[in-house]
Amino acid sequence: GRFRFCSLHLHLLDPARLPLALEALDAGMGVMAISPADKGGRLQAPSPLLQADCQPWEPLALAYRYLLAAGVSTLTVGASSPCDLNLAASMASSDGALTPAEQTALSRLELLRQQRLGETLCHQCRACLPCPKEVPIPELLRLRNLRLAHDLQEFTEERYNLIGRAGHWWEEVNAEGCETCGDCLPRCPHQLAIPDLLAET
């Protein structure tokens, strides 16, 4: 093929792109996970709730293992100080299959997410798009998922407040752009009340 390598946003708490990464790996391509710590929910400074949910592991360590065990070739660390490299160095050869204990922790994390969000969980299938008003429905509901399921309030508020102010690399329209036209409703396979959820966001 033409490509030998790709970079993707791959995160423990937002695994929507992992199937694409696995396809690339199956095709013999290298895959780099972009900012699995910071953009994945600022896992280097997790909420107490997320810390409790991931026990006995730190959320960042579990996130790195999740990606490495899937075969992801490279993780960008984004260190702000030398000590931030300690965890990465300790996990440099931790690319084997998940242990039963790690699998249990990941399953528990997913179960807790589903319990907390219930029938309002957005599965990030993107069937709701395109929105006539260009509201980035999946991204906004992803932030909602992270806030309510894992109490990542500081991270989600920061990301939301960057909408329309970050240039080409982030969204331009926030939830206020929704005019409740209902165009997205029949396309959602989970029957989410999308305009209502956006209003909460």
Model-derived features with residue positions:
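Short cysteine clusters
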Residues: C122-C131, C178-C184, C188
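Iron-sulfur-cluster electron-transfer modules
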Residues: W169-D183, Q191-P195
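Beta/alpha (TIM)-barrel catalytic core signal, keyed to glycine-rich beta->alpha loops juxtaposed to Asp/Glu
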Residues: G1-R144, A149-I163, H168-W170, D196
